[in-house]
Amino acid sequence: PFVAGPPSDGQKRFLRALFEAANEQQKFLHDGVRSGDMVRAVKAVFARHGLSEYDVYPPMHGIGLAEAESPYPDTESDYFLRSGMCVNSDISLFGHPDGSNRIEEGFVITEKGPESLTPLIRELVVKGI
């Protein structure tokens, strides 16, 4: 996520919600987790912050040759994440008065949790604003 210049208080609140959702998602990026459960957890963070109307895309998609390829889960998805899957976390909000922003990270799903393919982004998300 980026802001040109110093962030306003509204932009800070907005970014904190994105960071919170990205960090919450980490709890679900494990072998055997139902993909819809992960989507609902991310959406719950946005709902707590009153940001649901700006959440327009699923929070994860596959890594490959096309944009937003499978897996592309929604709240009703019942397939499981499996070790060895490579996914992009795509935590994003669009059309908010304080701006639109996205945190996109790559991960390999493992039995112990997500292995980051983008460690600098992961470090910045954990650090927050």
Question: Predicted segment positions?
Answer:
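Active-site neighborhoods and metal-handling regions in enzymes and metal-associated proteins
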Residues: 1-129
